[in-house]
Amino acid sequence: MSGTLRLEGMTVSRGAGPVVRDVTIDIPPGKVTALLGPNGAGKSSLVLAVGGVLPSKGKVLADGVDLHGKRPEKIRAAGVAIVPEGRRMLRGLTVGDNLEVACFALSREDARAGRAHALELFPELEKRLDALAGSLSGGEQQMLVLAQALVSRPKWLLVDELSLGLAPVVVKRLVPTLRTVAESGVGVLLIEQFAHVALGVSEDAYVMDRGRIHFSGPASQLREQPELLHSSYLQSGKAA
């Protein structure tokens, strides 16, 4: 499909051996795609490899153009935005300054438009622009890192563990925003340990465990047939 980010045959090694083995995932435009799996499945390693942070084998095809092996800034410039696990930001700077840093590669006009777009998605941050990022609540910090990723108006957005450490009410606020982003034409990959967080907003889903894909298909199939989670996602007997 035109506009798709395709991760093809990705293998990632850390330490003694591979933690991701020959994984292929399609992230089409205008949809939220879920990547599910237990802790240690290799999901975060895959995302870091896509972003050019970890060495890997395979292809990262952005609308047919292979970005594999490119430097992180080249990958971002091609329209791939990644929100890694852990809510990484400059905690000693204000919210406004963090957004300015995220705009460093943009023209003045694009930076102004991107910032306005991000604050439209997360109006809660408008009142906190002068607050230090480190003083924000966990939910506000997650909004900030999402806003930082979105100021550049990416074609694809990869979000790792959106719900980690957040109260359910905060997650309920954030997840629909990803659907709004997708409806604007962005291809969104939502990586989650907790299946229920991602399945409600996703159209397609992949289940990963021990570095391999064990299920790929419509998210509705996992919602309607929860036993599939127990046979693929829950090989270790743990439910999410």
Q: Where are the predicted features?
A:
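Glycine-rich phosphate-binding loops of nucleotide-dependent enzymes
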Residues: 2-240
